[in-house]
Amino acid sequence: MLSITPEIIKEIVQGEYHDVFAVLGPHAQKNGYVIRAFFPAAKTLQVKSKLDGSVLAEAVMRNEEGFFEANCNCSEKPSYYFTVGYGDKEFDVEDMYRFGSTIPEGDLYLFGEGTYEQAYRLFGAHPTEVDGVPGCRFTVWAPNAKTVAVVGDFNFWQGRAHVMRKHIPSGIWELFIPYLGEGALYKYEIRNHSGDCLPHKADPYGFAAQKPPEQASVVSVLDRYEWNDAEWFAKANNWTQRDRPISIYEVHLGSWKRVVEEDNRYLSYKELAADLIPYVKSMGFTHIQLMPISEFPFDGSWGYQPVGLYAPTSRFGSPEDFKYFVDCCHQNDLAVLIDWVPGHFPTDSHGLGLFDGTPLYEHADSRQGFHPDWNTYIYNYGRHEVKSFLMANALFWLEQYHIDGLRVDAVASMLYLDYSRKDGEWLPNSYGGRENLEAIDFLRLVNERVYKRFPHAMMVAEESTAWPGVSSPTSCGGLGFGYKWNMGWMNDSLQYISKEPIHRQYHHHDMTFSLHYAFSENFVLPLSHDEVVHGKRSLLGRMPGDAWQQFANLRAYYAFMWTHPGKKLLFMGGEFAQGMEWNHDTSLSWHQLEIDYHSGIQTLVKSLNRLYTDVPALYKEDCMSSGFEWVEADDRHNSIFAFLRKAKDEKPVLVVANFTPVAREGYRVGVNQPGYYRELLNTDSELFGGSNLGNEGGVHSEEIAWHQRPQSVSINIPALAAVVFQLDS
């Protein structure tokens, strides 16, 4: 048996002893059991029987800081509690050091292998019951720490009273604290291998957090919410497949709408459920995509520098409030996607960086572990425990919060070791290449596990390079995502539409080039938040000309986007052509809807969504070359584009767009089939703020061969407008 020396006692009362369970709690000895305890500032301690409350032993103080030792003459381990005296006050308390470990060995193995899909069931703070005693179990990974303690509002943020048990092979620490429950604030006090105390750390697996700028984790119950979306998941496959319409409304919850009268405060999750969801549904979008929801300290990061990956931000309410928001989305037939950030994490002292005094979650070498552009750490994807942490987090959002998919941020920065680095600032892989092999394996693993457990899910990559097979199955050598953002289309088309119409003829290729690769991946066409910040101006602000031309340009551009192959994504404010750049600190400019031009754009987006979801030819073969056919791709002089959208067993749709301020009357377009071509949408309609030049509802084909087709139609194309036709039955 361990000999308890004054030096060991001194280390315990200072919170520096590495193996407190070897000292504190009950220990068998020759004549019964010795029970040791440490209660800072306590004056007396009695060991009492749980059976009848009788005194089993009067403890002797061995250190005036509050270290006690009691001898119980009993043949079996006693069932006991403590009565602790602090002068004129006494308290009955459980001995937290009498409880054994509750961690299954199998869980430790899976975590160490990097394949633990439910790591959050092991780690973090879990209200539970052990041996009939309610309390909270804390578990954290810190293999190189000398000691780890739980600190919080329950112990005046002093760690020496709640030092944890270390599982030496795995580096995992745990402690069950009796009668500590939901709502308690806590962090981890970690001493590095030299015994130096680090800044208090938030729980990497914390399920709730204080509202910033406060930084503590909050004990939270995971599984209490009663969901009401079973009907939604029964039809889940209806909205994730490539042959379904997907129109995504991207939202920053903190600035969609604010309560100006109440100090410009945020809307809560429940208020957003009442206001945002009906609005998005009325606009005809099928999905809501939330910018990062995981807790983050700095508002200006928009959530892309998260500290609490497992905690929905408390800015808008509790975790259960967020579940309510998702639940309401599903009850209104809206899928929910969230931005997920596994590419990097911030350097905040309470975060993951140098977590146990060593580079634990990040690479030790800054050439691999530090991102110079964002001043953030980069995850060490080759470390199994880090893979378990991140993979389990992806699954956590889908399982615990019923999220329908993840948009993975900054994938390119993960794939390339030399991303945004000069020669000499990066390390090649084992083959001498620039590919981050460990990150590639990690992304494939996550996608495989997500789609295996949640076949209905939607995994989307924000990947800005020409990396092949991003949305191809891993079995075919791909990364395994379901979709990829089409950054090339976005950049080229915005570059084109921002030019004066007279110059567009020289940049015609910007609008046609995307069709050379449109079917190489499963694409989403993104007009995201990144395009309306940092001096880029709003989408409306990019349009050339006077006010009328700006709005007409934007209307035509939206119609081109909604009829172009690929799923759709539009950032909030774009649906009514907000005039100013997006500002995360203020509400959208909703007052602009009082202006007809702005309300006309809103009506157009609503009509485009309705058209898109009602006409299968516009979406069923979005990701197949058979779903698109150029009719006129070379009329650069007039800046006119004409194409067909097609699908098996569906009537084709003819789209003609004019990107000059000159109306083209009697413009002839070749068609394959004779008949009446009904005008489904005209962006120049007065409903949308246009001049109302059109085709009186449709046109009849004529037996005049044109564009290598046996038939043709003569149509009026308004200035800076797009018209959409479909062959009538």
From Swiss-Prot:
Q: Which GO terms describe its biological process?
A: glycogen biosynthetic process
Per its record, the protein catalyses:
Transfers a segment of a (1->4)-alpha-D-glucan chain to a primary hydroxy group in a similar glucan chain
Listed Pfam families: Alpha-amylase, Alpha-amylase_C, CBM_48, GlgB_N
**Which Enzyme Commission number(s) are on file for it?**
2.4.1.18
Origin: domain of life: Bacteria
Record's GO cellular component terms = cytosol
Keywords annotated in UniProt = Carbohydrate metabolism, Glycogen biosynthesis, Glycogen metabolism, Glycosyltransferase, Transferase
Which top EC class is given? transferase
The protein's GO terms of the molecular function aspect are: 1,4-alpha-glucan branching enzyme activity; cation binding; hydrolase activity, hydrolyzing O-glycosyl compounds
The active site lies at 409 (nucleophile), 462 (proton donor)
Chain's role: Catalyzes the formation of the alpha-1,6-glucosidic linkages in glycogen by scission of a 1,4-alpha-linked oligosaccharide from growing alpha-1,4-glucan chains and the subsequent attachment of the oligosaccharide to the alpha-1,6 position.
The similarity comment for this entry is: Belongs to the glycosyl hydrolase 13 family. GlgB subfamily.
Give the protein's recorded name. Answer: 1,4-alpha-glucan branching enzyme GlgB
Source lineage: Bacteria, Pseudomonadati, Pseudomonadota, Gammaproteobacteria, Cellvibrionales
What's the name of its gene?
glgB
